[in-house]
């Protein structure tokens, strides 16, 4: 079985490729990223480099790029891969950059699977519009042609890989039957030592990027409402909050909030925290939650964070609705006041993370890929005739 995977950057493609290899597939990845950036990728997996000047400029020169340019780059990358993709059995493409390659791969005998970590494009755009208003910035909708490309990918795919029920539930009911839930748990390091004792200054941490999706606004509102003595909030992000009036104004009022930039070892950041929070408005999975849990840090997450679906709220974490500063403040206050609860939840969190997989093992994800392959094997090919002979992969 020959499987082609296309992704502009590594993302979780090493986990996908490794899972496919475990199930007996021969895998080739097409990407604009060199192989050295694909950590822990099985040696048997081949990689075809499809250059992208824009991706290179973003990575090496840290050149700021507009959304319009990114949309155009995904189109160009997709058509570049379509020109070189080899005949095979299955093509798995990353959402928004796979439509042309899907057509080419299907003409050459492959079946198309879409990898979509984020919610349905219409759901996500509605959320972005609402959050733009809350943060005080103009809403910039995706161009119509880019939306249509994504809708066409959904329709064209035989199956869609999604990391959570949260993502799956945003799709139309008629489409949910072809979505396979594949939790992105599998890149979680377990430090030999942790720091379960409470710090002299009660420290809450959060990790994330895009302010429109990560719920920082509600966390800052909760933090300001609490006004806890001897407490500090650490925000690990590369985002520039000065571009968002709603965030900028709150940060000016809060002296006990620090923005943390590059951290050589993210485990060091987690172990500075007494509590970790993912206040996400939109997070298809959110692996940072389990990274913190592996460091024996009790966590609070919203139900719009896909990884929260693996928690038992009140035992190994606290799950709250998104966009609710009041409930977030209550959850933080309970862990601030009740040290026994905080310690018990921290221990249970690490145990849950260990039970789900250690040292890059990913049993939940591997099982989901097995389900995908079984579904394809049990469904007859209808979209394209198989080629008479396979060329060398």
Please provide the spans of the model-predicted regions.
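Membrane-proximal helix-turn-helix segments that form the acceptor-binding/catalytic region
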Residues: 78-86, 99-101, 120, 135-159
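Short alpha-helical donor nucleotide-sugar binding micro-motif in glycosyltransferases
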Residues: 154, 262-263, 269-273
């Amino acid at each position: 079985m020959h499987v082609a995977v296309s992704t502009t950057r590594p993302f979780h493609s090493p986990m996908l490729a490794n899972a496919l290899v475990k199930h007996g597939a021969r895998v080739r990845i097409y990407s604009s990223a060199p192989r050295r950036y694909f950590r822990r990728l099985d040696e048997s997996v081949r990689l075809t480099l499809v250059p992208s000047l824009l991706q290179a400029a973003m990575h090496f020169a840290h050149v700021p790029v507009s959304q319009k340019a990114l949309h155009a780059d995904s189109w160009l990358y997709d058509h570049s891969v379509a020109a070189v993709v080899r005949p095979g059995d299955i093509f798995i493409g990353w959402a928004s950059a796979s439509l042309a390659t899907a057509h080419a791969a299907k003409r050459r005998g492959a079946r198309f699977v879409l990898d979509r970590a984020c919610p349905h494009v219409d759901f996500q755009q509605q959320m972005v519009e609402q959050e733009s208003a809350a943060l005080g910035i103009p809403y910039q909708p995706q161009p119509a042609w880019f939306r249509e490309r994504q809708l066409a990918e959904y329709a064209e795919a035989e199956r869609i890989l999604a990391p959570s029920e949260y993502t799956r539930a945003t799709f139309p009911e008629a489409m949910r039957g072809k979505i396979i839930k594949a939790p992105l748990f599998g890149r979680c390091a377990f430090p030999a030592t942790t720091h379960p004792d409470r710090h002299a200054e009660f420290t809450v941490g959060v990790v994330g990027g895009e302010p429109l999706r990560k719920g920082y606004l509600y966390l800052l509102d909760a933090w300001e409402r609490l006004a806890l003595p001897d407490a500090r909030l650490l925000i690990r992000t590369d985002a520039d909050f000065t571009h968002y009036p709603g965030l900028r104004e709150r940060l000016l009022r809060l002296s006990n909030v620090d923005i943390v930039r590059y951290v050589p070892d993210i485990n060091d950041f987690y172990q500075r925290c007494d509590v970790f929070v993912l206040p996400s408005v939109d997070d298809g999975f959110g692996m940072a939650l389990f990274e913190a849990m592996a460091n024996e840090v009790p966590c609070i997450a919203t139900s719009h964070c896909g990884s929260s679906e693996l928690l038992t709220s009140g035992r190994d974490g606290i799950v709250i609705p998104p966009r609710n500063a009041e409930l977030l403040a209550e959850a933080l206050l309970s862990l601030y006041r009740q040290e026994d609860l905080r310690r018990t939840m921290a221990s249970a969190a690490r145990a849950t993370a260990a039970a789900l997989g250690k040292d890059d093992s990913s049993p939940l994800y591997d099982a989901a890929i097995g389900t995908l392959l079984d579904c394809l094997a049990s469904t007859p090919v209808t979209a394209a005739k198989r080629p008479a002979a396979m060329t060398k992969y």
